[in-house]
Amino acid sequence: MLQITPIPALSDNYIWILQKECQAIIVDPAEAQAVFAFLAKHQLNPTAILLTHNHHDHTDGVAGLVAQFPDMLIYGSEEVSQFANQIVYPEQQFELLGLKVRVIESAGHTAQHISYLVDNEYLFCGDALFSGGCGRVFTGDYQAQFDALQRFKALPDFVKVYAGHEYTQSNLKFAEAVMATSCSLMEHQERADILRSQHKPTLPSTIGVEKQINPFMQAVTLDEFIILRQKKDNF
């Protein structure tokens, strides 16, 4: 049975651990020590790392983990080639721990950002999509980020969204400022506030929920998306 657990890291990162029996897959290790502690506590053997993009708060733990577990497979796009020993490309599919993994192009935040859709049910999207928001455009461009959101919108509503940061509360404040008031948005703001007051993650979300509460997922045109993204950058 698959278990998915977030390890809080740095100020607001999540390192996601996919656990199946005694084996584990690590997504975007921001640091190594927290992962070591989790693996030891649960007596897990890490078999692979999935990297979404080349920002230090998603890769800084790789070197330490590889030093301890040198046989791990490390997947990523060409922009993380200094870490990855398995370079993957959009729409490539592979299997880990009996799980089918599909690579989804999600550039924009960075030029070669990718996401991983596991068993057509679990989306590990790094900084391409957050609950209520999306990543800033750095080394990618607005068109690429907009296109990535269209790919996410095309996924089934039941797909769970495992983003790389706990940004939900601030994102929903922005959503409240730019979207028409809705019961769904208010309910999710209340839910996020309660969870964070209990020091619990607001993630995962789902694609269906994000279509309702995420202004960037509701942008119909590129121009509309750019206006929203620039407003959020200065919010």
Curated annotation (Swiss-Prot):
Entry keyword annotation includes Zinc: yes
Record SUPFAM superfamilies: Metallo-hydrolase/oxidoreductase
Cofactor(s) needed: Zn(2+)
SMART domains reported for this sequence: Lactamase_B
Highest taxon of source: Bacteria
Binding-site list for Zn(2+) 1: H53, H55, H109, D127
Keywords: Hydrolase, Metal-binding, Zinc
Keyword Hydrolase: yes
InterPro entries: Clx_II_MBL, Glyoxalase_II_hydrolase, HAGH_C, Hydroxyacylglutathione_Hdrlase, Metallo-B-lactamas, RibonucZ/Hydroxyglut_hydro
Co-factor remark: Binds 2 Zn(2+) ions per subunit.
Record GO biological process: methylglyoxal catabolic process to D-lactate via S-lactoyl-glutathione
Pfam families named among the record's database cross-references: HAGH_C, Lactamase_B
The protein's annotated pathway: Secondary metabolite metabolism; methylglyoxal degradation; (R)-lactate from methylglyoxal: step 2/2
GO MF annotation list: hydroxyacylglutathione hydrolase activity; metal ion binding
Listed EC numbers: 3.1.2.6
Recorded family membership: Belongs to the metallo-beta-lactamase superfamily. Glyoxalase II family.
Assembly and binders: Monomer.
UniProt name for this protein: Hydroxyacylglutathione hydrolase
Organism of derivation: Glaesserella parasuis serovar 5 (strain SH0165) (Haemophilus parasuis)
Gene: gloB
